[in-house]
């Protein structure tokens, strides 16, 4: 097709069967090792940004301590990028936030998390300890980017109150929770983040939670 190269229908069918054979071989190899209590090989993981930064590191360190012969790699991206990597067989297992989106992927709940609204301590933003959903219309926000599980969950929560994301005053969409926290240090706006990501900031008093 012009300057593009693409597989024919037969080629796609062959590729699909080759991928299945490869997966079956990897599974057989894994199960054969288990028969001899051997844990070797490679495990390619993928995780959305918040999970990769705040949840997995201690778990991966513990895993490596127990299974030193297993080679681990971790791909970091937003939830949709990780789902795409899983579909393309670039990773063996993915960890994502948010809602179950794709019917051809099997999702299993890993842990529960909570999104919270936060401002920097001492912010000039006129918010107390609690606001109503309708007050969000009048507050400047900084949010995660499109494709992130954090934004998906927040948008679904808004829909439960008949609020459209497009009707809010979003100053910035940023690609990581760390970026949001740094942004909040220098601006008077409200951020929506995972509560797991702000443990240190809450302890040090840099940020405070605003209940919605």
Language-model region placement:
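Central regulatory/effector-binding core of bacterial HTH transcription factors
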Residues: 36-103
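Beta-alpha-beta core module
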Residues: 103-109, 113, 175-212
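Alpha-helical "hinge/linker" immediately C-terminal to small N-terminal DNA-binding modules
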Residues: 6-37
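Secondary-structure junction motif
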Residues: 141-162, 195
């Amino acid at each position: 097709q012009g300057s593009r190269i693409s597989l024919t229908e037969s080629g796609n069918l062959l590729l699909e069967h080759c991928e299945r054979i490869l997966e079956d071989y990897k599974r057989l190899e894994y199960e054969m090792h288990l028969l001899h209590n051997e844990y070797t090989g490679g495990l390619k993981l993928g995780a959305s940004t918040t999970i990769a930064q705040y949840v997995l590191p201690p778990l991966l360190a513990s895993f490596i301590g127990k299974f030193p012969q297993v080679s681990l790699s971790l791909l970091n991206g937003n939830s949709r990028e990780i789902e795409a990597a899983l579909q393309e067989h670039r990773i063996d297992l993915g960890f994502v936030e948010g809602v179950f989106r794709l019917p051809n992927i099997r999702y299993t709940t890993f842990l529960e998390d909570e999104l919270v609204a936060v401002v920097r301590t001492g912010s000039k933003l006129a918010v107390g300890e609690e606001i109503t959903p309708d007050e969000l219309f009048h507050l400047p926000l900084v949010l995660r980017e499109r494709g992130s599980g954090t934004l998906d969950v927040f948008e679904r929560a808004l829909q439960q109150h008949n609020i459209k994301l497009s009707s809010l005053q979003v100053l910035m969409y940023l690609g990581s929770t760390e970026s949001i926290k740094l942004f909040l240090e220098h601006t008077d706006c409200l951020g929506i983040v995972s509560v797991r990501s702000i443990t240190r900031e809450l302890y040090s008093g840099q940020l405070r939670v605003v209940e919605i």
